[in-house]
Amino acid sequence: MKRITRIIRPIICMAVLLFAMTTAVMGCYQKETEPIDIPGRTPSGTSAPQPSATPAGEVIPSVDRQAELAEARAKNPDTVAWLYIPGAEVDDPVMQAEDNGYYLKLDENGEYAMWGCYYAHCENEIGSRDKLDKNTTIFGHSASNCDPDGVRFTKLYRYMDADFVKENPYIYLSVDGDDLIFQITALFITDIEFDYINPNPIGGELTDFFQTVERKNWLDFDGVTFSEEDTV
């Protein structure tokens, strides 16, 4: 049985050129801005998750990417996790370096690639479930045309359709010995004035973080809430 980590934040950051983010900050609030319906979506993953039952009886699809994670790490020791987002067709390793700019134009094998790879914020600690920071950030490129069938995190624009989010509510992050399930509870576009990459906001910073997420969130999720106790 998988324990659900209550927050992931699909945040699409438009202020950084060709740069997007996929961390999901969830919540259940009425917003003035309506989500944008993007036609022509083709949501499909590379493999079908297997269901597992939660204590409440809800069936949550679970995945196992430990073999893929181990293989990727054998090829590149900078590999720290495996990211699986079925709705965005993401099923790839996550790198991490001492500088966030290192993998900007390098793929997971360390070779030049215009669209880079997925990589974690250099200040995040990514190990076991218990070692995750309060706020984990994963970076990836996004094309300026916002094509929901485009490269890398450009596909996150599919999540601007509320119905699509309901059909694809989970994101998976595999770390050493554990396959984590995150539930999407918020969606919004932000600029870099919001410090959304702070690994461990505390006190007033933490309160401000969640209040900002609540204010920016576009979608309502019936029965799904988030709080300062959650990991994002």
Feature roles, as predicted:
Residues 1-14:
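N-terminal Sec-pathway targeting helices
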